[in-house]
């Protein structure tokens, strides 16, 4: 749990990940970035979207915020988007102000039912906890698609308004990484009811590796921010930064041709340190022999996750419009 600076200045530091967070010897975690938590709303005044929080699992603790846009009629069926928030596996939340504001807009503009997953964060819960939570939550949501295997804590919005023939997953940055690995797992394992993913939305995906790609600088690569983040959130990762979870082309990584979806949309931003890695990922998927369609949308002059921080700009509106066109 994060503590205020005033109560931690005298504590002994165990380790830290500047400028994101610090861990103290007593186990206290102090986070320096990330937006404040906000409650769900029966009706957002800007978009008319209704939100509520649900419990998916009590052990481990996995929950979600569900977004339901204004309905044309009480029996309307909507596409479903299971969304994994970003934050370097150690920051942010499905209940944060930034993601609440952003997903209200996405749900409204795309007319989609969004299930935003609250997975466990590092360092309290080092990876692969977030991947395990993401997969558990995905199976829980898809179990609503069949009458025989509905969970005991089934959600009425999903049952009444979810169209499981239009079922998508996606996320931003580390959340896009979780979505990618979930899509690979879907290609190898069956979801409840044999459900298939209609597409994957990958916004500024967090991938990395021991060798620079494209125009990534060679000098300083070993001390790059993504490498420091990965070593912090998954210190025991087999293969380190070339673990297949973070490097999809690492030795032993699953073949990208096995991605369990028919289409993918990848976003990159010109001023983002992850730009080249996102383009590299797009090219790798396209050349893998995968039978699906992958599209790349580039926003030159924009920063990492600009659409979340500044959803009012023209480029953000364009990006959200592309999402709406993708989620059909």
UniProtKB/Swiss-Prot annotation:
Molecular function GO labels: 2-hydroxyisoflavanone dehydratase activity; carboxylesterase activity
Keywords on record: Flavonoid biosynthesis, Hydrolase, Lyase
A Pfam family reported for this protein in Swiss-Prot or TrEMBL: Abhydrolase_3
Motif (Involved in the stabilization of the negatively charged intermediate by the formation of the oxyanion hole): 85-87
EC number: 3.1.1.1, 4.2.1.105
Catalysed reactions listed for this entry: (2R,3S)-2,4',7-trihydroxyisoflavanone = daidzein + H2O + H(+); 2-hydroxy-2,3-dihydrogenistein = genistein + H2O + H(+); a carboxylic ester + H2O = an alcohol + a carboxylate + H(+)
Residues forming the catalytic site: 173, 272, 304
Pathway(s) this gene product operates in, as recorded in its UniProt entry: Secondary metabolite biosynthesis; flavonoid biosynthesis
Record family assignment: Belongs to the 'GDXG' lipolytic enzyme family.
Cited function: Dehydratase that mediates the biosynthesis of isoflavonoids. Can better use 2,7-dihydroxy-4'-methoxyisoflavanone as substrate. Has also a slight carboxylesterase activity toward p-nitrophenyl butyrate.
Name recorded for this polypeptide: 2-hydroxyisoflavanone dehydratase
